[in-house]
Amino acid sequence: MTFALNMLRYRAPPASLFVGGIAGAWLDSFDRTTLSQDSAGATPVTATGQPVGRISDKSGNSNHAIQAVAAARPSYIVANGLSRIRWDGVDDRLSVTVPVGGFTGTMVLGTDQGTASYGVTIPAGAYDIGGRGGLYFPGNAIVGQVIRNGALSAQEAAATEAYFVENGATAGYGSVTSFTNFWRNWSELTSFPLIDTSAGTNFINAWFDCTSLTSFPLIDTSAGTNFINAWRGCSGFTTFPLIDTSAGTNFSAAWFSCPSLTSFPLIDTSAGTNFSFAWFSCRSLTTIPAGLFDSVQGGNFTNAFASTALTQTSIDNILVSLVASGIAAGTRVFDQSGGSAPSSTGEAAITTLRSRGWTVTVTGGY
């Protein structure tokens, strides 16, 4: 009952989130009274198709989102009774000048593709609304965004999400099939929500260079086939969850340069054909479980484990697993450097692989 009352309370515009001068920004694309065609706020937006050079901040902090360059202004769009600001995916963006001290707290973002709450740390200076450089954004249009210095409670976050959904945002990401570049270079993210990704097939570059994430939720990736660069450069990861990758075929550079990752789970690689550079430069990676590659469908492991720190048991596990796969046609390359050389068990596996046409390079030069 208390939760329901709180939800009702916050379905009104979330002004209470900023009571007492709490820092942050509250930007609504559906409240046309806050939209201007120019960055100074002199020319109001009055019709669909007009450019947006300013969204006035409704938090009381005057952290307005502006764009002084006319060619980089997004468009105000009204379709099916819903008001949104649409990005061109090239250079459109608005910028908030984050004050000294920055923001550490919660960001709630409502878009045409989905709505979610994130933990963030945003340093002082210019911060892009509309994705990094106008390129990377989880949707095509924004409905609203709240950034608060100080974490929102679960109830506050849920109610703010509901507020955006009631005003035209899509409730979840459950209908999205391609997450390509959605959160790429979002280095401000410190935590990622358990959103619905069950329809996702394409995760290319989805979390590329989310450098401040230290963990990742057990999202549903059961339909995912393409994971190229998906978590590349997530330098804060120390572990990775046992997500469902049973449909995954391409894992090229998926965890490239995750230098804090120390171990890896026994994910399902049974449909995988390409693992080139998958764990390249994971310099702290020591532990790979036995059987990880027993059922793979292809042998492209070019530089897959170069610049890692694998234990002898782990490199043996990998080599024995590749033998178990039975791959004897197509691309057959395996590279490891750094870490331990294989034992006699691993060396025997290398001999078998080479007899099947594999090119194998390992620490120690066997």
Please provide the spans of the model-predicted regions.
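Extracellular/surface-exposed low-complexity segments
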Residues: F3, S16, A341-Y366
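Structural signature of tandem-repeat unit edges
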Residues: P99-G102, T170-T177, S187-T201, T211-T225, ...
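Low-complexity, glycine/proline/serine-rich flexible segments
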Residues: V52-V100
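Conserved hydrophobic beta-strand positions in leucine-rich repeat
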Residues: F264, N303, R332-Q336
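Extracellular glycan-associated modules
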Residues: L8-T34, L82-L152, A169-A171
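Repeated polar recognition positions within modular binding domains
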Residues: D92-S95, S117, A126, G131-A141, ...
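Acidic glycine-/aspartate-rich tracts in secreted/extracellular proteins
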Residues: S29-Q37, G41, S59-S62, Q113-A116, ...
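GGW-centered surface loops in extracellular recognition modules
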Residues: T2-Q67, A141-G144, L152-G172
